[in-house]
């Protein structure tokens, strides 16, 4: 199916099957479609709502065209969300990655600069002195030595350049917002995937099952966050060994008091970094303590997804202990140090 046929189908609010979607996505990602065609297709898909088959087909093509990262480590996990929740709080899932590493987990973190928010994972890490332009081999060395490696999405998804213009001009969430967390270049099969709408939780868990994932927690909080929230119950669709279950969790389930998100919002990556360093360090401020509890909830979910813990409650307890050792803050500094060496190698 070509793009013109797909547009005619979508205009009638009819779904494409997986193979048809793969054909259209290959055209888009190989520069065979005009900006007008891409924009019209993305808007049409959003208006009718993307089907599971369509999301699977699109993700398969993005994975096929990505520059892969091979990491010789068992039970790799990712903490990557769709973004677009409009809340502008600090980089919770990125901070959680360092707690996971401090607890003995291994994180292959996939991310980008902010699109609609104030600080994307790449913005935060760059502010912390982490060099982003790494080769696949260098990313693998980060994971193996530090416990965290960062894959800067533009470096691994070069074919995305064909959709950047239409996406920017639309200025709306589109299919591509959902695809980022599903197209980790290291091929992780375990992750915490935050989404901008509760209606996406179960469908995306089904998508991840079809893409071969083993253990995934798709999360959306009732206050709108694409994270496990400190301020409201969070809906989770959990994929584990081919089965999907859905449930609600709240901080009190883990011995943590629910609190407002006041003080956790940020204006940019430097502010996010300062809050995270306080949370991972001595927690000298009230906001730093609150941020630490939010990080622990999400790191605990990642440890559970990685099967480093037997339950979500056990994962949160493990994350709590890891954060309070101070090792997580050390991991952030270690990642900055090792990537500084790689920067010198690359520029030599």
From Swiss-Prot:
Cofactor: Mg(2+)
Positions bound to Mg(2+) 2: 226-227
A single cellular component GO annotation: cytosol
Keyword Acyltransferase assigned: no
Amino-acid positions noted as binding anthranilate 1 in the UniProt annotation, renumbered to this chain: 81, 112
Top-level division of the source organism's lineage: Bacteria
GO biological process entries: L-tryptophan biosynthetic process
Binding site for 5-phospho-alpha-D-ribose 1-diphosphate: 81, 84-85, 91-94, 109-117, 121
Catalysis: reaction(s): N-(5-phospho-beta-D-ribosyl)anthranilate + diphosphate = 5-phospho-alpha-D-ribose 1-diphosphate + anthranilate
Signal peptide extent: none
Chain sites annotated for binding anthranilate 2: 167
One Gene Ontology term of the molecular function aspect: anthranilate phosphoribosyltransferase activity
Family per record: Belongs to the anthranilate phosphoribosyltransferase family.
Function: Catalyzes the transfer of the phosphoribosyl group of 5-phosphorylribose-1-pyrophosphate (PRPP) to anthranilate to yield N-(5'-phosphoribosyl)-anthranilate (PRA).
Protein name: Anthranilate phosphoribosyltransferase
Species per Swiss-Prot/TrEMBL record: Azotobacter vinelandii (strain DJ / ATCC BAA-1303)
